[in-house]
């Protein structure tokens, strides 16, 4: 796997879970002898919603809700076979989306 790179993109609503998962991935990759660049925090995507409080009248009375999506990006440079096996066996918490690309 010479001159290849693994790009990992993490996505979660809770920043603590995503930071914990990123730390586990970095620790696993460094333990197997790979070089890790990151985790790089990407801009947080914020979706805001306005919902009417009353089902009938009072149009001006609304609740405002938001969903924040946190993203992290990291590259593993020159991964070994042990690195790939360790990453496949890694158990990450529920609520963290993982996207892996081999470049």
UniProtKB/Swiss-Prot annotation:
It comes from the Bacteria. Keywords: Ribonucleoprotein, Ribosomal protein. One of its GO terms (cellular component) is ribonucleoprotein complex. GO terms for biological process: translation. The keyword Metal-binding does not apply. InterPro entries: Ribosomal_uS10, Ribosomal_uS10_CS, Ribosomal_uS10_dom, Ribosomal_uS10_dom_sf. GO terms for molecular function: structural constituent of ribosome; tRNA binding. PROSITE patterns: RIBOSOMAL_S10 (PS00361). Gene3D superfamilies: Ribosomal protein S10 domain. Involved in the binding of tRNA to the ribosomes. Part of the 30S ribosomal subunit. Belongs to the universal ribosomal protein uS10 family. PANTHER family: 30S RIBOSOMAL PROTEIN S10 FAMILY MEMBER. This is Small ribosomal subunit protein uS10. The gene is rpsJ.
């Amino acid at each position: 796997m010479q001159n290849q790179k693994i790009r990992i993109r993490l996505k979660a609503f809770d920043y603590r879970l995503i930071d914990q998962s990123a730390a586990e991935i970095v620790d696993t990759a460094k333990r197997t002898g790979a070089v890790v660049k990151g985790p790089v925090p990407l801009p947080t995507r914020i979706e805001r919603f306005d919902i009417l409080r009353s089902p009938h009248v009072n149009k001006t009375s609304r609740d405002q809700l938001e969903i924040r999506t946190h993203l992290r990006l990291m590259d593993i440079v020159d991964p070994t076979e042990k690195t790939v096996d360790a990453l496949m066996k890694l158990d990450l918490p529920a609520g963290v989306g993982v996207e892996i690309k081999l470049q």
